[in-house]
Structure formats: C-alpha cells, structure tokens
Amino acid sequence: IKLDLRGFEGGHSGMEIDKARINAINSLARLLVDIDGLQIAELNGGVKRNAIATTAYAIVSVADRKSAIKEINSRKEDILNESKDTDPKGEISVEEASFDGKVLSEDLSKNIINCIYTLPNGLYKKYKDEIITSSNIGILEDSKDEIRISSMIRSQIDSAKYNRAAIATNIV
C-alpha cells in the first residue's frame, strides 16, 4: 500500500505551532499505527527540522490489504475532517502498490510507527499569545540503512525543554 500526504499548510515550528496545523509525519503514523502485519518498505517526510511537515509518504506491506485500506481510509477521513479549517488544501492518497525490495520486520515496523506516533509533537504550553514550549517532528528520512527522525524541541524554560526531550528519549 502506498500512502501519500501532501498540500498541508505547514509553517515555521517556532512561530506557527499554535495554529493546530497538521504535521504530515505525525499523521502518517496515525494512519499506520496498529495495522495488522504492517511491514515498512519506505518511509519519508518533511524537509526541515524547524518546519511543520507538509508532506510524507510510505510504502508498506500488510497482512490483509483490503482490511488495512478500509481502516486507513477511515482514519484518513478523520484527519481531513478535523483539519479542514487549518489545512484546506491537504490531501491524503491511499492506493495499492507493489514493491520488490526489502521490507522491515513486523516488530521493527511496529516499533518505528509507534515511536513516531507517540513522540511529542505540537504546542505544549502557551501564555497569552506567546509560545512557551513546543516540539515538532520535522524530518523522517529512510536511507535504507537507517530511519532518522529529526525533532525540534523549543522552550523558554530550560526544565520544560529537558522534560520534553526526556519524554522523546524514553520513547525511542
């Protein structure tokens, strides 16, 4: 199955994280979490650590293609409905695909998707109009030897920044 997320509004993660815009990387994990028999073939998204990801895509193998596509399409509609005001141009395509290369094991694939799904992402604390603490999953990069997730954690309070970093570290 190939999933392609594109056209989301994005923005600078330090100045626009409070706009509740969709992060395509986080949403990709939301589409794939707990899908039976999932094995990752390819996984990529975002372009800058400090930018809210506007694009992401995955090619995955699943145990039951028909059932997986049905579940993913249901989640897709949820994401698009909840983001229609903040990301009206966002698109998510889900289609059958073939892939002849290697795929990751089910366990490793599940761990990677769960990691992305649970990483802190978005506004954490705001005071009046000022963003105090936030985090952003900016880049998801599959180099075939490793999958890298780049996240940026910001805070005006050091202990809050270290807290967000500790949460992320414990997930990974």
Language-model regions: role of each:
Residues 157-172:
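Redox- and metal-dependent alpha/beta enzyme cores, enriched for Fe-S-associated oxidoreductases
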